[in-house]
């Protein structure tokens, strides 16, 4: 049995915490009755060891062991820095 590590891409929406950030993951879901695709957003708390991310950055994250009550994801890399 293979254990595939889950990786996702999202945009940083908050970086006010020390060594933590909130990443919004957007996905499209088809409505079961009408068939229209609806945008859904999931917010995940992510561990950022070096505080290298800012608001608006596009990041890649991966699932890990629970680090706190709400954090079980860690930063892999910054895909794109936000334009300030």
From Swiss-Prot:
UniProt xrefs under PROSITE patterns:
RIBOSOMAL_S17 (PS00056)
Which gene underlies this protein? rpsQ
InterPro entries (alphabetical): NA-bd_OB-fold, Ribosomal_uS17, Ribosomal_uS17_bact/chlr, Ribosomal_uS17_CS
The task this protein performs is described as: One of the primary rRNA binding proteins, it binds specifically to the 5'-end of 16S ribosomal RNA.
What name does this protein carry?
Answer: Small ribosomal subunit protein uS17
GO BP annotations, alphabetical order: translation
Give an example GO cellular component term for this record: cytosolic small ribosomal subunit
Provide a Gene Ontology MF annotation, just one.
rRNA binding
Disulfide cysteine pairs (residue numbers)? none
Q: What's in the keyword line of the UniProt record?
A: Ribonucleoprotein, Ribosomal protein, RNA-binding, rRNA-binding
Q: Note the CDD domains from the entry.
A: Ribosomal_uS17
State the family it belongs to: Belongs to the universal ribosomal protein uS17 family.
The record's note on quaternary structure and interaction partners says: Part of the 30S ribosomal subunit.
